[in-house]
């Protein structure tokens, strides 16, 4: 799906260049991506996320487990509502991750406008509804996918907050997030966020990635008492909790 989202960014630009009316999914259509959250299912999802992450980064998984005990999705709900996003809609959940990840990669701070958040949600909905396996997902599958994206967004936001303005750490986080997104087909460095959603960076005059800017391999975890490593963010974005990874699992079962 990430590759489909990347393609939608180019298509959005082509529509603007052709002076065509920009088609954004209507709320009635995106409502197909709503689900009624089950707290029992959420706890099962949390446990599953921790178990998967343990295979990638045992130390990071322990921290993730501690954070998930606080039910971060419930804590995110009022914050996302400020920009018009919901935790019980798959497109909104993907938009929350997409925006948070893009901001990390580009070093952007401050709250996104409701207009931008709404445009990215609709852009996400267009791509999701064009992916039959995801569009036809059961409520349980929608919840699992959405909550995976919300947990990813939480991980990125928490890492950036803990960096406490340290530019070196923030840059390292951005590289890790970009690496994870790239592994699943989403090139965040090639995009810019506008009131119409994401567009190719070149079309807006935004700076291209610097030559040789390919993210370097990051340590999976930092030394105790030292700065943290952010390889877990790359792993989560690329495979551990990514939508592509989850889709293969979720679409293989019912319920």
What is the role of each PLM region?
Residues 157-255:
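A cross-kingdom marker for long, charged
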Residues 48-74, 111-124, 194-210:
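An acidic intrinsically disordered interaction segment
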Residues 26-47, 134-172:
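Long, charge-rich low-complexity segments
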Residues 1-86, 90, 188:
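N-terminal Sec/ER secretory leader and immediately downstream segment
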Residues 7, 11, 15, 52-59, ...:
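Surface-exposed polar/charged interaction patches
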Residues 7, 95, 222-224:
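Proline-rich, low-complexity linker regions of envelope-associated factors in Gram-negative bacteria
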Residues 79-158:
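Extended amphipathic alpha-helical interaction segments
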Residues 46, 94-97, 230:
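Sequence-level detector for tyrosine residue identity
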């Amino acid at each position: 799906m990430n590759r489909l989202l990347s393609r939608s960014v180019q298509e959005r630009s082509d529509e603007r260049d052709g002076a065509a009316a920009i088609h954004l999914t209507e709320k009635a259509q995106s409502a197909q991506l709503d689900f009624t959250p089950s707290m029992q299912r959420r706890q099962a999802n949390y446990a599953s996320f921790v178990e998967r992450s343990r295979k990638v980064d045992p130390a990071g998984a322990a921290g993730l487990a501690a954070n998930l005990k606080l039910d971060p999705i419930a804590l995110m709900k009022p914050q996302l509502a400020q920009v018009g996003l919901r935790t019980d809609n798959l497109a909104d959940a993907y938009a929350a991750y997409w925006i948070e990840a893009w901001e990390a990669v580009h070093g952007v701070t401050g709250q996104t406008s409701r207009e931008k958040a709404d445009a990215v949600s609709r852009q996400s909905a267009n791509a999701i509804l064009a992916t039959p396996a995801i569009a036809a997902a059961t409520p349980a599958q929608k919840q699992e996918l959405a909550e995976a994206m919300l947990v990813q967004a939480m991980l990125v936001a928490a890492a950036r907050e803990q960096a406490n303005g340290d530019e070196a750490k923030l840059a390292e986080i951005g590289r890790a997030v970009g690496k994870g997104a790239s592994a699943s087909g989403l090139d965040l460095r090639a995009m810019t966020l506008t009131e119409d959603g994401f567009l190719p960076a070149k079309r807006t005059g935004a700076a291209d990635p610097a030559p040789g800017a390919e993210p370097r391999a990051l340590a999976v975890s930092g030394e105790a008492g030292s700065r943290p490593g952010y390889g877990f963010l790359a792993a989560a974005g690329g495979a551990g909790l990514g939508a592509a990874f989850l889709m293969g699992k979720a679409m293989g079962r019912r319920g």
